[in-house]
Every structure is written in C-alpha cells, then in structure tokens.
C-alpha cells in the first residue's frame, strides 16, 4: 500500500516496558554500578571491550556486535541493555514523539559521509542527482540515518524535489524489513512498503532505478550493472564538508532512561570513557613504529585527515558537531521522520551539554 500525503506510517513492533534496575556491585569496598553495553566492533572502542579503558564508578559487561542492525532492532524492541549504540534516525524520531525510553550522550561511534550510498542501475541513464526525479528509488527504511542525510543533501545542495520520486521500502538483500518508528510523511511524498521483496531484487529487475542505502545492494560488484551516482564520492564528500561543516553522525550512544534517572552521573563518566578510548585509538593510528592496521601509509593518511579536519578529526561532544546535529534536526523534520522540529538541547541531557576543560 502506498502511503498517503501526511499519513503516519506505523512500525511493526512497539517498545518494551521498563526493565530491571542496574546492579550495585562491590569492587574492593567501593560501590560500583554494573551496566551492560552493546556496541559494534570498532577500533575506537576496542580498549573498552578489553577492559583497558574504564569509567569511574561503573563496572561494564561489554557485548560486541558485528552489525548495527541487530543492536538497533533488539534495543528499540526490547531494551535489552543498559547502554547501547543506536541509530541517530531512530533516536531522534522516538524523542520527537516523547516516547524515547533512552537518553543520548554525544558519543558518535559511527560517522560516515554518504555520497557513496547512492547506487543506480548502469543502464538507467542517471548521471546527475536531478535525474532521480521521476524515478523509483529503493530505501531500506525511510528513517535509516544514512538515507536521511542523503535526502537532505539531495534536496538542499542538489535541488532535488523529493516529491517527484517514488520511494519503495524493502530490505537491502532480504525481504521482510520494516520501519522501526512511526513516520509522519510530508505532503506529496509517495512511499510504498514492499515486504515481499528486496532492494537488490527490484534493482536487478528494473523495478527501481536507484537505491539509497548504507549497505551496498547485492548487484554492486564493480561489473557496471550497478554503479555509484558519485563515482568519485570522496571528492564530492570533501566539497560538501568544506561548504557545510557537516560530518554525518550515523550512530550515537544511549542510556536506558530508567538507568539514567537513577544515576545521572554515569552520562559524563561514560562520555569520558569513550573519548579516552578514541584518543588512544588515534595515537595508535598515527604511530609509524609498526603497522597498527594492515594498510600502507595508514599513519600518513591519519595525519592528512587531521590536517583537514583539525586536531580531533572525529569529535565527540556537542559544540564541535553542532552544525551536523542542527542539519540532521532540519533534515529529519523536513522529511517527516520527526513529529516536531527538534533542537540540539532536546536530544541530550544537561549533564553532558558542557565539558569541563583544564
């Protein structure tokens, strides 16, 4: 069924009720809050998983996952952990509706430019972003964070009218995927869920001419059948960053609301832990003594990126990312992912809005 203009598209499952309280454990006579943590397998959280970087007053049980999809599905459905990585799109939508059972801290474990996320059929005749108008475009979810950013820059930077595109929603390589949040689609948007098929299948059959997805469709293997809209996507992304200051935030860390309300101090302590783990990661990457990762010139690349992005090329905290967060609030509102216009202060508790400096 195609969604009507202004229609609220509901997800297929709801949120779990409030869960247990965190356990207070005794660590050598010092009380400590025990928390479970779910996060993807990142180099910049490695030392947290290994127990080498810790948060004061907190004992962690880390659970490391290979993909964000499972974490987001399980946390939005059942709130299985105390601290969890979460899609920015899901979080901002739930928060705008006043039903978010979690609060965020400005730790952004995944930041990725997304000009690379637009895939088109090689024979479709799509050469520029404006060529997407009048076409059918597949998306894994309207509220997928990557797609929100892509539609945002297509509309604002490329002048694409999103209402002139027919949007088909399905799993990237498997059928059955559905939205995880309620949508409030803008007037004129033509949106149709397709649980019976996949984006890859529709791309192969020509039912869609393009796919916008963080994960590449199965047909993208370099043979020319499926190609990127921006072949030199790094150059396009660098121009976009220089012009706008936007370095897209894909995921952020969240705390189950009931846990945060019991122990609000854990927010800043967790922030400091993640920030320290990231700092150590960059120190390793910029060390020429040995090959920290199996790529030639990796340390030189880290220095090159730092020269363009500043001394902290992957910032946590609000102020260094304010332009990005404000743009995402605007994109999400304009696209009907949020049910009201959100501000930066709506997204983070006062405990983590300012950082102490020495």
Label for each model-derived stretch:
Residues 9, 23-26:
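Short, positively charged and aromatic/hydrophobic N-terminal segments
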Residues 317-358:
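Long, low-complexity C-terminal extensions of enzymes
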């Amino acid at each position: 069924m195609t969604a009507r203009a202004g229609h609220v598209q509901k997800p297929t499952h709801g949120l779990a009720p409030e869960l247990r309280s965190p356990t207070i454990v005794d660590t050598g006579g010092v009380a400590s809050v025990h928390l479970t943590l779910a996060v993807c397998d990142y180099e910049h959280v490695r030392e947290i998983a290994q127990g080498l970087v810790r948060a004061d007053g907190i004992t962690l049980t880390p659970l490391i996952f290979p993909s964000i999809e499972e974490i987001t599905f399980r946390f939005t459905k059942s709130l299985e952990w105390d601290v969890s990585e979460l899609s920015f799109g899901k979080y901002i939508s739930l928060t705008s509706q006043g039903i978010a059972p979690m609060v965020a801290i400005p730790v952004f474990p995944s930041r990725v430019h997304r000009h690379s996320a637009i895939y088109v059929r090689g024979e479709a005749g799509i050469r520029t972003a404006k060529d997407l108008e009048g076409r059918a475009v597949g998306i894994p979810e309207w509220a997928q964070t990557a797609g929100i950013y892509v539609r945002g820059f297509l509309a604002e930077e490329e002048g694409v009218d999103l209402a002139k595109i027919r949007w088909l929603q399905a799993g990237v390589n498997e059928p059955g995927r559905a939205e995880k949040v309620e949508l409030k689609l803008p007037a004129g948007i033509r949106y149709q869920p397709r649980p019976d098929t996949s984006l890859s299948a529709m791309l192969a059959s020509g039912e869609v001419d393009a796919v916008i997805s963080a994960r590449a469709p199965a047909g993208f293997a370099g043979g020319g059948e499926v190609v990127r809209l921006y072949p030199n996507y790094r150059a396009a992304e660098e121009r976009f960053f220089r012009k706008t200051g936007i370095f897209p935030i894909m995921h952020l860390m969240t705390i189950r609301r009931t846990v945060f309300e019991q122990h609000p101090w854990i927010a800043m302590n967790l922030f400091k832990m993640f920030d320290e783990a990231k700092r150590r990661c960059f120190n390793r990457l910029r060390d020429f003594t040995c090959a920290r990762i199996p790529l030639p010139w990796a340390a030189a690349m880290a220095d090159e990126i730092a020269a363009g992005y500043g001394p902290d090329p992957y910032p946590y905290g609000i102020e260094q990312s304010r332009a990005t967060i404000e743009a995402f609030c605007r994109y999400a509102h304009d696209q009907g992912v949020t049910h009201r216009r959100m501000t930066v202060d709506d997204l983070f508790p006062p405990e983590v809005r300012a950082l102490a400096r020495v």
